[in-house]
Swiss-Prot record:
Belongs to the Ycf4 family. This is Photosystem I assembly protein Ycf4. Its main location: plastid. It is found in: Plastid, Chloroplast thylakoid membrane. GO terms for biological process: photosynthesis. Seems to be required for the assembly of the photosystem I complex. The chain crosses the membrane at residues 22-42, 57-77. The lineage of its organism: Eukaryota, Viridiplantae, Streptophyta, Embryophyta, Tracheophyta.
Length: 185
C-alpha cells in the first residue's frame, strides 16, 4: 500500500512480523524443545515427555547430541522471536518532492542503532535499480535506489514476493515520481 499524492510518496515496510516468521519460530521452538527434553530424559533415565520414549536412547553419544541440537534450536528460535517482538526491518520510505528530501526509516534491534534513519536530498538520487536473482527453485526481485555517495539502498519489502511484471510496474512508478531512470538486470 502506497500513500501517495502528486508531491509526497509514503510506503510502509512490513518488517519481520509476518505469518511465515511466526510459523517457523513456533515449529523451531517445538522441535528444539522436544530434542532437548528427549536428550535430558536420557540423562535422567525417565521420560519427561509422555509421547516420546527415551528408553532406547543412550545418553553418552545420542543424548548429548540431542541436547546440543535442542539448545542450538532454542537459541535460533529465541532469535526469531526477538526479531518478531522488536519488529526488526519495519519502517517506511518517504519521498517529499515539496521539500526535496528522501527519508528511509527502519527499526533494528535494541541498542544504539535501534532506529535506522537515512535522510538525503532528492537531487542525490541517480536512478532506480532493479535486480533479479534467480536460483533453482525461486527467483527474487529486489528494488534499489542509487544515491550519490551511498551504497545501493534496498527499497522493496522483505516478504514481498512480487512477480517480474509487478516489480517493473512498481519501479516505473517510483522512477516516474522521482524523475530518474531505471537500470535493470
Amino acid at each position: 500500500m502506497n500513500n501517495q499524492s502528486k508531491r509526497l510518496w509514503i510506503e510502509p515496510i512490513q518488517g519481520s512480523r509476518r505469518k511465515s516468521n511466526f510459523f517457523f519460530a513456533s515449529i523451531l521452538f517445538g522441535g528444539a524443545l522436544g530434542f532437548f527434553l528427549v536428550g535430558f530424559s536420557s540423562y535422567l533415565g525417565r521420560n519427561l515427555l509422555p509421547l516420546l520414549s527415551s528408553q532406547q536412547i543412550i545418553f553418552v553419544p545420542q543424548g548429548i547430541v540431542m541436547c546440543f541440537y535442542g539448545i542450538a534450536g532454542l537459541f535460533f528460535s529465541s532469535y526469531l522471536w526477538c526479531t518478531i517482538f522488536f519488529n526488526v526491518g519495519s519502517g517506511y520510505n518517504q519521498i517529499d518532492e515539496k521539500t526535496g528530501i528522501v527519508c528511509l526509516f527502519r527499526w533494528g534491534f535494541p541498542g544504539r542503532n535501534r532506529r535506522i534513519f537515512l535522510r538525503f536530498p532528492l537531487k542525490n538520487v541517480h536512478m532506480i535499480k532493479m535486480e533479479v536473482q534467480e536460483n533453482l527453485f525461486s527467483s527474487r526481485h529486489i528494488l534499489y535506489m542509487k544515491v550519490k555517495g551511498l551504497p545501493d539502498i534496498p527499497l522493496a519489502r522483505t516478504g514481498e514476493n512480487l512477480n517480474l511484471k509487478e516489480m517493473e510496474q512498481k519501479a516505473a512508478e517510483l522512477a516516474r515520481f522521482l524523475h530518474v531512470s531505471i537500470e535493470g538486470f
